[in-house]
Regions:
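Serine-dependent amide/ester hydrolase catalytic core
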Residues: 1-62
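Structural helix-boundary/capping segments
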Residues: 67-138
Length: 138
């Protein structure tokens, strides 16, 4: 029932808040979670795939949704591939997601700013490659 689903979601959120991403007075979040959001792999629309299976209802990308913690997508590069449609080298984004304790969105923004200042990652600009700086045609 809906009531059971809400109870399960609340239990999961409380567990994450109490055991995984705990609020810390000095650092805001006592830990960070990092997972690959997009690995830059192709997924052609004109390819036949296996039929859908039974959904599990959960993946790493659902932690934020079910617990209410921030999930920040951070583009870190791009992967080249030869398109079987255009027969040219094209690029797909590669990104990681960073999770922190509830209410620590600002801490993640600060971390990203520090990484840009240190030259670890590039600042992003809509419509341009984060690696080469070239304009991307959509």
């Amino acid at each position: 029932t809906i009531k059971d689903a809400i109870a399960n979601k609340t239990t999961f959120g409380n567990w994450i808040e109490d055991n995984v991403f705990v609020v810390n007075e000095q650092t805001c979040s006592d830990s960070l979670g990092i997972y690959v959001g997009n690995s830059g792999t192709t997924n052609y629309r004109n390819a036949y795939r296996n039929p859908p299976g039974i959904p599990t209802g959960f993946s790493t990308s659902r932690i934020s949704i079910f617990s209410g913690v921030p999930d920040f997508v951070l583009p870190i590069g791009q992967a080249a591939y030869v398109s079987n449609i255009t027969q040219q080298t094209e690029y797909l984004p590669v990104s990681v997601d960073i999770l922190a304790a509830k209410g620590c969105d600002g801490m993640i923004f600060g971390l990203v700013q520090d990484l840009v200042k240190a030259g670890v990652i590039n600042a992003t600009k809509a419509g341009y490659s984060g690696v080469t700086g070239e304009k991307i045609l959509f």
